[in-house]
């Protein structure tokens, strides 16, 4: 019975597609991050994040495409931070973060193609292969920090990028942050104005 229920309930190979975040350096401690403000604009589907690090204010907008496995972000900072793309091996567990950082020999991340504004990474682990397409606006350099760890370093104080996960190399046009933002805004506007929402705020 347990085997049958697990067939429905358990992912046989729980897979973390990757960590995307700011490359702030190992010397940064949680206490160094001050004035944290984060809010979700539910009408447009945008997360607005603000914080201060070493007296430098950061403002990040993050949005998800409604139909593709794609996120986009806009970073504003006087001292630009790198964007990290860090890929773990799955743990196979059920109640953890699915990240095994001690198994770099069991999976690989290779740079398939690159130009001045985009790059494609190929992820291979066991029998699974998927692709990570990164595109950006403005000058930036993508470098391999270590195995399964890439950093995109911009030079401008305002920087935007998109990242898409696909089972094959994507043949679709690469979208900009603005295009993803517009797609998200249109999707959520339609959701809130055309969908049905039950209001229980007056219930006692």
Question: What are these regions, as identified by a protein language model?
Answer:
Residues 1-204:
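Acidic/polar, glycine-enriched structural segments that form the non-catalytic walls/loops
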């Amino acid at each position: 019975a347990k085997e049958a229920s697990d067939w429905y309930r358990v992912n046989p190979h729980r897979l973390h597609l990757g960590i995307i975040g700011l490359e702030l350096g190992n010397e940064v401690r949680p206490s160094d991050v001050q004035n944290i403000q984060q809010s979700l604009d539910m009408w447009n589907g945008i997360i607005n994040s603000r914080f201060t690090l070493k007296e430098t204010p950061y403002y990040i907008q993050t949005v998800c495409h409604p139909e593709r496995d794609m996120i986009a972000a806009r970073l504003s900072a006087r001292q630009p931070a790198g964007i990290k793309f860090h890929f773990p091996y799955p743990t196979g567990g059920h109640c953890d973060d699915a990240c095994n950082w001690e198994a770099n020999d069991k999976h690989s991340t290779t740079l398939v193609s690159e130009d001045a504004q985009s790059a494609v990474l190929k992820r291979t682990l066991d029998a699974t292969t998927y692709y990570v397409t990164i595109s950006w606006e403005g000058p930036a350099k993508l470098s391999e920090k270590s195995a399964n760890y890439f950093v995109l370093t911009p030079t401008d104080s305002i920087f935007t990028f998109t990242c898409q996960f696909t089972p094959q190399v994507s043949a679709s046009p690469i979208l900009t942050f603005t295009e993803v933002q517009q797609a998200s805004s249109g999707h959520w506007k339609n959701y809130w104005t055309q969908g049905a929402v039950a209001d229980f705020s007056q219930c006692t």
